[in-house]
Amino acid sequence: MIQNVGNHLRRGLASVFSNRTSRKSALRAGNDSAMADGEGYRNPTEVQMSQLVLPCHTNQRGELSVGQLLKWIDTTACLSAERHAGCPCVTASMDDIYFEHTISVGQVVNIKAKVNRAFNSSMEVGIQVASEDLCSEKQWNVCKALATFVARREITKVKLKQITPRTEEEKMEHSVAAERRRMRLVYADTIKDLLANCAIQGDLESRDCSRMVPAEKTRVESVELVLPPHANHQGNTFGGQIMAWMENVATIAASRLCRAHPTLKAIEMFHFRGPSQVGDRLVLKAIVNNAFKHSMEVGVCVEAYRQEAETHRRHINSAFMTFVVLDADDQPQLLPWIRPQPGDGERRYREASARKKIRLDRKYIVSCKQTEVPLSVPWDPSNQVYLSYNNVSSLKMLVAKDNWVLSSEISQVRLYTLEDDKFLSFHMEMVVHVDAAQAFLLLSDLRQRPEWDKHYRSVELVQQVDEDDAIYHVTSPALGGHTKPQDFVILASRRKPCDNGDPYVIALRSVTLPTHRETPEYRRGETLCSGFCLWREGDQLTKCCWVRVSLTELVSASGFYSWGLESRSKGRRSDGWNGKLAGGHLSTLKAIPVAKINSRFGYLQDT
């Protein structure tokens, strides 16, 4: 039976590879038809704003002030949130923003915002900002942003209606929004842990003291009185207005270090800790925390008080902004060093160095395209949150794609394929007669895999990162004509459903650990993205979906694919495949309907 299934599937895969060109042509034609059918569709929460940049909107360089841009962004996003909620909304946070392009006088700013996903009373709004030159008709991407808004009603508690995504892009954003929300909820604790665990070497002793600027010289303090024009229809201060004031004092602090007009390149998350109303006095404080070779970090905090006689001030916001100084060719210039004050100044100095490392790790892991990220990424405490996020979001985004092609169907097990650039992805699904929570329990603990999957010889738990993330060392038998067995170092991230209709997720990807380097007795394998998604279909019914990504040339050369680990031996692009026949894996998956979770051992047991 297994051999017959394997033969059928191998023939199906051979058909997939031999007819790749015709499938791609048919897929393009289908996409063109779908686009034509959906030309009239527009997201009901989408809000657009277009503003002509006037001299009153610009800074000393004749470019649009980032503070003014932040106000426009916040207004557009708030209107989108209120369109969905049907009631007033307030800004809760704004994720990290990286500015790719500046905007000059006479150009147009086009801002588009739409709700990606709604939770109980909060929602994530995605914002895209582009600039347009009316004379040359050229357009540039300026930045992307993600904001969280909270719906507010005075009498009843808000329960937001759910978003129903329609397009592929909407499905991807909707799926990943839950993981981004997870990151935001633990953001403060994550930063504290990372800063506590990151050993940042001090280099103050090796720096040229003649070029040092005392940090105290960059300190700025400014007070603002919140007036009715600064507030929304609820009397709360506009989040965008507070962000604009913060950008203003940060720019002054940066200018005092470099004695030039700096350019803001990035903002770390704005998090509104409390509200501010008309009549409040806001005290904004800024100081340069650290100066690197071509950039500097400025820390800003905002405190509010109601009356001059009040002794207690409310901390309502903090942010860290990265500035550069550009020359005539728009290249960053060298900056003078900063000399921090003893005590808190030295603490801020080292924390800024840690945050820089975190930003680089985050940008490398999260922002890079799939083709730019190596199969294995080094794991350490400074990037664990972003590796887990990338692990889960990559799998969710792959599952959400709507251009999968049905390649084969055998005994109600469907195999889909998707070719994209140099990657060929597989998507296998079937309905199993087992509760989704039980299937999730079985599949999420890799230590139980050798009990029911013959391609897992041994699994060792290397590190329990947190409740839902763990790193395993996996070995598999020597297959495919190789004399050496393979081993893998795998980050496994599991997620329970965030809401009704969400899947259980088990995401796998390779990482590297200094404690588990390559050894002569094993061929080190790597996996880019693979895992399971499980949907509850009814009482004791679960739709089980397994997905993985492979390099196209390896699949074409070998004609095989593996169940849980798509491997490539390090340094050998034409080798390293396990050579596992699909029939064995299909029979393993089909065994789930006649299985149960053993409460004592936790593995799949035939009934």
From Swiss-Prot:
Inducing stimuli: By cold exposure and repressed by heat exposure.
Pathway(s): Lipid metabolism; fatty acid metabolism
Enzyme Commission (EC) number: 3.1.2.-, 3.1.2.2
Molecular function GO terms recorded: carboxylic ester hydrolase activity; fatty acyl-CoA hydrolase activity; lipid binding; long-chain fatty acyl-CoA hydrolase activity
Subcellular localization, as worded in the UniProt entry: Mitochondrion matrix; Cytoplasm
Key word Cytoplasm present: yes
Swiss-Prot/TrEMBL keywords: Cytoplasm, Fatty acid metabolism, Hydrolase, Lipid metabolism, Mitochondrion, Phosphoprotein, Repeat, Serine esterase, Transit peptide
Enzyme class, spelled out: hydrolase
Key word Mitochondrion present: yes
Tissue-level expression: Isoform 1 is predominantly expressed in skeletal muscle, liver, testis, stomach, spleen, lung and brain. Isoform 2 is predominantly expressed in kidney, uterus, hibernoma and white adipose tissue.
Phosphoserine: residues carrying this PTM: S15, S25
Principal subcellular localization: mitochondrion
GO biological process: acyl-CoA metabolic process; fatty acid metabolic process; intracellular signal transduction; negative regulation of cold-induced thermogenesis; response to cold; response to temperature stimulus
InterPro entries: Cytosol_ACT, HOTDOG_ACOT, HotDog_dom_sf, START-like_dom_sf, START_lipid-bd_dom, Thioestr_dom
Residue positions binding CoA: T91, A92, S93, N120, S121, S122, R181, H271, F272, R273
Transit peptide stretch: 1-13
Example of a GO cellular component annotation carried by this entry: mitochondrial matrix
Location of the START domain: 375-585
Catalytic reaction(s) noted: hexadecanoyl-CoA + H2O = hexadecanoate + CoA + H(+); tetradecanoyl-CoA + H2O = tetradecanoate + CoA + H(+); dodecanoyl-CoA + H2O = dodecanoate + CoA + H(+); butanoyl-CoA + H2O = butanoate + CoA + H(+)
Residue ranges of every copy of the HotDog ACOT-type domain listed in the record: 43-155, 216-329
Function: Has an acyl-CoA thioesterase activity with a preference for the long chain fatty acyl-CoA thioesters hexadecanoyl-CoA/palmitoyl-CoA and tetradecanoyl-CoA/myristoyl-CoA which are the main substrates in the mitochondrial beta-oxidation pathway.
Protein name: Acyl-coenzyme A thioesterase 11
Source organism: Homo sapiens
